[in-house]
């Protein structure tokens, strides 16, 4: 065997080129499969295997991608994934890197069922206090179902066996497939418009989750909730549960159980009827005896009554009421008179003439007070002026002159208090108590 010299691959190179070929050729793919070997380590990444009956492929979904998945995958679950084919080069493993994941088949329907269930529960459609009691004496049952299905046969058979007197009115509708929920809503609305039955039985036989899906409709849930007639939901087998079961006033596990719930056994019904009749007879007899005793008592009282005495009592009663009425009228008139006097007095006090007199007196009083206050103010001001004049006179230079002193100033009117301020020949002015003297300095003597 001849070995080529230039075209020998390393393992890393081979795995790298395989990865490039796979990623470049296939790109993004959608894949449907069953989960196995699922693991979620502390890193937050998911590792799993997707398989069908013949093959399997390893998959990885990293933390940044799996955080958008609205459910927790489990082994055995069918899922629909979108991802890119790649190769994990360190081991040479071919794998799918998942970007998005959805439940597939019944898994998706189950997820939608739980989401709608939570939404309607939050809106109060399942609340126990909104459930209506079923009528006690049901005469007519409205059955909403397919007229050709097994459910209607079971219902009619049970009713015929237990209570043939019950009348059945069928509101035919589609109970499977597209737009079946709208047909059921229409049948319920027709029954509510006619109001010809006592209760509605919504029913169909068993089937897959997909077969029963029309009973998981939000529109149907609101129609059942708003129905004026009580609704019993009897859909599928005992293990089947639909949204209509939660919203209905009563849930029955099967169509036959729904019919039994709404009917009474003939033997038991006859026995109960006999019991009711017996009680009615006893009640009638007791009532008759009671009325007879009451009639006898009234006859005895009537014999004891004297019409003349009764008339006198009424006359006396009339006189008493007349006196009380006269006293009440007198008191009322007296009260009205006092009220009138009070109002007249208040009116006089509120009259403009009275108010004018009051304001005139008040103005005169205020004028007197103002004049007195002004006189007091003038007297006080005069005293303050006299006191200030006396104080000024005490410190005034003129007061000093009156005691024989004089004030000498130079030509610039500056007071001379030192001979050194003058020179021979300066003109000076001497102010006496009476008059002034103009002088010329001829000699200066320093006495310091």
From Swiss-Prot:
Keywords noted in UniProt: Cytoplasm, Exonuclease, Hydrolase, Nuclease
InterPro entries: Exonuc_VII_L, Exonuc_VII_lsu_C, OB-fold_nuc-bd_dom
Disulphide bridges: none
GO cellular component, one term: cytoplasm
CDD domains according to UniProt: ExoVII_LU_OBF
GO MF terms, alphabetically ordered: exodeoxyribonuclease VII activity; nucleic acid binding
Subcellular location: Cytoplasm
Quaternary organization: Heterooligomer composed of large and small subunits.
Role, per record: Bidirectionally degrades single-stranded DNA into large acid-insoluble oligonucleotides, which are then degraded further into small acid-soluble oligonucleotides.
Name used for this protein in its record: Exodeoxyribonuclease 7 large subunit
Taxonomic source organism: Shewanella sp. (strain MR-4)
């Amino acid at each position: 065997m001849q070995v080529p010299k230039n075209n020998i691959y390393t393992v890393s190179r081979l795995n790298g080129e395989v990865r490039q070929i796979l990623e470049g050729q296939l790109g993004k793919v959608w894949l449907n499969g069953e989960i196995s070997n699922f693991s979620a380590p502390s890193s937050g990444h998911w590792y799993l295997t997707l398989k069908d009956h013949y093959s399997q492929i390893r998959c990885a979904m990293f933390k940044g991608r799996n955080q958008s998945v609205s459910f927790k995958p489990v082994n055995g679950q069918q899922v629909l994934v979108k991802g890119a084919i790649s190769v994990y080069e360190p081991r040479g493993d071919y794998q799918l890197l998942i970007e998005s994941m959805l439940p597939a088949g019944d898994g998706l329907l189950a997820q939608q069922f739980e989401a709608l269930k939570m939404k309607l529960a939050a809106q109060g459609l399942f609340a126990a206090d909104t459930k209506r009691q079923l009528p006690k004496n049901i005469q007519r049952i409205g059955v909403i179902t397919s007229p050709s299905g097994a459910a209607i046969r079971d219902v009619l058979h049970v009713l015929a066996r237990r209570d043939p007197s019950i009348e059945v009115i069928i509101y035919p509708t589609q109970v499977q497939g597209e737009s079946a929920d709208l047909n059921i809503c229409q049948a319920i609305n027709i029954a509510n418009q006619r109001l010809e039955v006592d209760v509605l039985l919504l029913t169909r036989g068993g089937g897959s989750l997909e077969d029963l899906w029309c009973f998981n409709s939000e529109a149907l849930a609101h129609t059942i909730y708003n129905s004026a007639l009580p609704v019993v939901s009897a859909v599928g087998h005992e293990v089947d549960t639909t949204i209509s079961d939660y919203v209905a006033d009563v849930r029955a596990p099967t169509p036959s159980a729904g019919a039994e719930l709404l009917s009474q056994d003939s033997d038991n019904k006859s026995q109960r009827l006999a019991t009711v009749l017996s009680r009615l007879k006893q009640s009638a007899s007791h009532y008759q005896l009671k009325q007879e005793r009451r009639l006898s008592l009234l006859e005895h009282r009537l014999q004891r009554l004297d019409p003349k005495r009764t008339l006198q009592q009424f006359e006396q009663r009339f006189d008493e009421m007349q006196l009380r009425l006269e006293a009440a009228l007198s008191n009322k008139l007296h009260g009205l008179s006092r009220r009138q006097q009070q109002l007249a007095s208040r009116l006089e006090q509120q009259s403009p003439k009275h108010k004018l007199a009051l304001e005139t007196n008040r103005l005169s009083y205020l004028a007197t007070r103002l004049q007195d206050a002004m006189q007091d103010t003038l007297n006080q001001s005069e005293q303050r002026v006299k006191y200030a004049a006396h104080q000024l006179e005490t410190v005034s230079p003129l007061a000093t002159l009156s005691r024989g002193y004089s004030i000498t100033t130079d030509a610039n009117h500056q007071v001379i208090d030192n001979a050194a301020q003058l020179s021979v020949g300066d003109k000076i002015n001497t102010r006496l108590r009476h008059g002034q003297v103009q002088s010329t300095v001829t000699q200066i003597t320093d006495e310091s």
